[in-house]
Amino acid sequence: MEPKFLRAEEVAQELSVSKPYAYKLIRQLNEELKGKGFITISGRINREYFNERLYGARKEN
């Protein structure tokens, strides 16, 4: 089972970007989640939200 959250290292590797840029993306995505009323963890991003926002992939129920 995959962890629910991605760390900056995993985001950087997935997108082939630098670690500081990965942190910038995570901050931006976490701000979006905070705006929707979610609690966020600094330096980590929900895997499902990451995939939805970056790839447009939504999990069908």
Each PLM stretch: what is its role?
Residues 2-21:
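Polyanion-binding surface elements
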Residues 12, 51-52:
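Residue-level preference for well-ordered alpha-helical positions
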Residues 17-51, 57-60:
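Major-groove DNA-recognition helix of helix-turn-helix-type DNA-binding domains
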